[in-house]
């Protein structure tokens, strides 16, 4: 996450890193270039651009804005739910850290390192990546067979939760913890499982592909045809206004694609 000072409006106006502009700049440059060429050819009487009725573009733009707002709302809800789930993961990990002081210091350290390993494995699962976990090898107290099973497991983060659950059961049977303490710690483990299930649901249920493609194509068609509608009335101001309108629509389209994947 990029943290910036939002109190400085001037700096925010000219921000580049972390904005949507680098993503849409190629398409935006093509639209502005097309508008400039169109204005130049028309002013030199080399070419008379076909006039597209503005009322048609007005209605088209309103409809397109409504559908873009629907898509952006749906994508933002996915992003916000992902943030809430990860916040729940952080809060639950802190609860485990606080409530696990009833365990011996060694068992508590193993438990907390496994919770940390679970978070890292879940992150890698959601981002479809594999980061090295050598840091945890001597800290999570897994046997060689357990490590082999971990790397071969289709859901490594779930495997870690199962190992935590088994250790808590052993601690209960040996009398290290009471059944009340076990239930409290187990509830936190259940909450971690719920977080993973929620993240998996978001990851495996994207917005309908056909819906995204339809809006994507419509936005680009609208932006590339727009100069033909505005050139007759705006003249040399056409590239500027077309660039601003295209930046708005192309930016909203690209922004919704980023929000659709809340896990980076």
Where on the chain are the PLM-derived regions?
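Alpha-helical transmembrane anchor segments
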Residues: 26-48, 53-57, 67-71, 201-264
């Amino acid at each position: 996450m990029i943290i910036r000072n939002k109190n400085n409006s001037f700096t925010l106006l000219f921000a580049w890193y972390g904005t949507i502009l680098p993503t849409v700049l190629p398409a935006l440059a093509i639209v502005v270039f097309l508008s400039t060429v169109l204005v130049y050819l028309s002013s030199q009487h080399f070419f008379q651009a076909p006039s597209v009725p503005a009322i048609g573009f007005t209605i088209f733009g309103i409809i397109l804005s409504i559908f873009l707002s629907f898509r952006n709302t749906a994508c933002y809800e996915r992003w916000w739910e992902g943030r809430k789930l990860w916040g729940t993961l952080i809060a639950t990990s802190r609860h485990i850290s606080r409530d696990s002081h009833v365990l011996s210091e060694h068992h508590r350290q193993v438990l907390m390192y496994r919770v940390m390993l679970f978070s890292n494995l879940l992150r890698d699962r959601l981002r479809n990546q594999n980061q090295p976990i050598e840091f945890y090898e001597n800290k999570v107290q897994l046997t060689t067979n357990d490590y082999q099973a971990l790397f071969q497991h289709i859901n490594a983060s779930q495997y870690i939760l199962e190992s935590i659950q088994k250790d808590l059961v052993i601690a209960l049977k040996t009398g290290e913890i009471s059944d009340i303490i076990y239930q409290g710690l187990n509830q936190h483990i259940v909450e971690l499982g719920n977080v993973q299930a929620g993240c998996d649901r978001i990851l495996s249920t994207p917005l309908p592909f056909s819906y995204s493609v339809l809006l994507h194509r419509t936005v680009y068609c609208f932006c590339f045809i727009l100069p033909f509608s505005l050139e007759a009335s705006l003249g040399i101001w056409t590239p500027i206004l077309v660039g601003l309108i295209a930046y708005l629509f192309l930016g909203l389209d690209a922004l919704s694609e980023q929000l659709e994947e809340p896990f980076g």
